[in-house]
Amino acid sequence: MRPGFSQNYPQAEPEPLPMREDANSRIFAFVDDLFFQAKIQETARKLNVKVEFVKAESDLTERIKQNGEEKPSLIIFDLNNNSVKPLSLIPKLKSKHKKTSVIGFLSHVQGDLKQKAHEVGCDMVLPRSAFSQNLPQLLRRHGASEEEETVN
């Protein structure tokens, strides 16, 4: 290497393999904020992970039935989503899907809501900024199929 030159060139990330159109989703999101929907979709696309946005408990139940034996790995809640009432829906989902992780995100100033979300069964509650920052790791961890998890 010549003096004065560094090998710290940015490395291009390899393109993910194309996702099968019939792949079951293991991650569901109750998010109606368009900014966060776009952020989640773009991150999932880059990681080749399928995330489905649902608007009601009935939508989630229907999608889970269509997946057959494969259970959801992660359910994401925007805790400020008034259309689904997360604090009443989370305990119902946790009782039906005990092994499913539930992650909520909210404004960093909503300490009371954070506490209530933990009390009703939310496994992790993050401020919006931390959720955005950790989104790739969360999707990567929960997006692998059950067969891939047993191999790794």
Language-model segments: what does each one mean?
Residues G121-P136:
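Output/docking surface of receiver
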Residues F35-E52:
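Two-component/phosphorelay signaling modules centered on CheY-like receiver
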Residues T100-H108:
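A short, hydrophobic beta-strand element within the central beta-sheet of small alpha/beta folds
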Residues A56-L74:
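Acidic, metal-coordinating helix/loop segments flanking the phosphotransfer/catalytic sites
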Residues S25-L34:
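Conserved acidic segment of CheY-like receiver
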Residues M1-A12, P16:
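Long, low-complexity intrinsically disordered regions
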Residues I76-L93:
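Conserved phosphotransfer microenvironments
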Residues V109-M124:
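Alpha4 helix (beta4-alpha4-beta5 surface) of REC/receiver domains from two-component response regulators
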